[in-house]
């Protein structure tokens, strides 16, 4: 058996995998254990009481975190006319139609989010095989196909996260960076949980939010005490 790294030994010593942590204690411990040479993200996994095999129980959407994610986001926008001007004014890095599509076909993918106005989908639709596998295809369900281009760009720049359950009914996303103050991480988590509650499928039965775990990019997961989350859930 290979030896554990010093970092992993410390994590194993300090993390009780059977314990449900109070939220404040969890953030404090995550900060203590975040010793990577880069600023780690704080990630969350939310187990939902849904049947992911049923299309009407899948959960997908987007929400703006009040304190952002700590990442700078580059936005590409497919639109034209007045919306193109609005996109530029809102801070989009790339704005265009066929010219932007040509850049993408040539492998120029220097962006994190793609937004499109409805009239531009005739162009964007031809890029499905490129954008789809990368999770970049615009979709009205997460607000990236919209007539309100300026708002969509502003939201993306402000720290909007997109979420979608996996085949096990779990939402994986980020709520900020480990150097955020604990209260900012908590408020970001509150925003996510509130959005997930609003997105609850009508056909989902029983306990909806079953478990919440927090971790950093290189750290172990901490299970959160549900009673500590009563105000959120």
From Swiss-Prot:
Q: What CDD domains does the entry give?
A: Ribosomal_L1
Q: Which molecular function terms from Gene Ontology are attached?
A: rRNA binding; structural constituent of ribosome; tRNA binding
| InterPro entries linked to this entry | Ribosom_uL1_bac-type (IPR005878), Ribosomal_uL1 (IPR002143), Ribosomal_uL1-like (IPR023674), Ribosomal_uL1/biogenesis (IPR028364), Ribosomal_uL1_3-a/b-sand (IPR016095), Ribosomal_uL1_CS (IPR023673)
Which Pfam families does its entry note?
Ribosomal_L1
Q: Quick one: a GO cellular component term?
A: cytosolic large ribosomal subunit
Does this UniProt record's set of keywords contain Ribosomal protein? yes
Keywords noted in UniProt: Repressor, Ribonucleoprotein, Ribosomal protein, RNA-binding, rRNA-binding, Translation regulation, tRNA-binding
The GO annotation for biological process reads:
regulation of translation; translation
Tagged with keyword tRNA-binding: yes
Describe its function: Binds directly to 23S rRNA. The L1 stalk is quite mobile in the ribosome, and is involved in E site tRNA release.
User: What NCBIfam families does this protein's entry cite?
Assistant: rplA_bact
Cite the record's note on assembly.
Answer: Part of the 50S ribosomal subunit.
Provide the family line: Belongs to the universal ribosomal protein uL1 family.
In its UniProt entry, what is this protein called? Answer: Large ribosomal subunit protein uL1
Q: Which organism is it from?
A: Hamiltonella defensa subsp. Acyrthosiphon pisum (strain 5AT)
